[in-house]
UniProtKB/Swiss-Prot annotation:
UniProt name for this protein: Cell division protein CrgA
Compositional bias of kind Polar residues: 9-22
Keywords assigned by UniProt, alphabetized: Cell cycle, Cell division, Cell membrane, Membrane, Transmembrane, Transmembrane helix
GO term, biological process aspect, one: cell division
Transmembrane feature ranges: 38-58, 67-87
InterPro entries xrefs: CrgA
Subcellular localization(s) per the UniProt record: Cell membrane
UniProt keyword annotation of Cell division present: yes
Chain positions covered by the region annotation Disordered: 1-25
Amino acid sequence: MPKARVTKNETAPVSSNPSANRTPVKINSAGTPMWYKVIMFAFMIVGLAWLIINYLVGPQIPFMADLGAWNYGIGFGLMIIGLLMTMGWR
């Protein structure tokens, strides 16, 4: 019977220690600072509050009435900033 082909992996020496073949990776366990989380959630909550206040009493508040439809851009913009900050949260 013909002999099967020998692959590269079969001829490579096998280490008795499986962790010897791995490259050590340094893990930063510090996480995100507290101020980052506070600002991130503050952006999202202030944006939501802006939209709710605009919907409920926007025409009665002079500067919000002057902004008109820009209130939606401000509210959603603040929430999007908070959402984008979640990508840096560890």
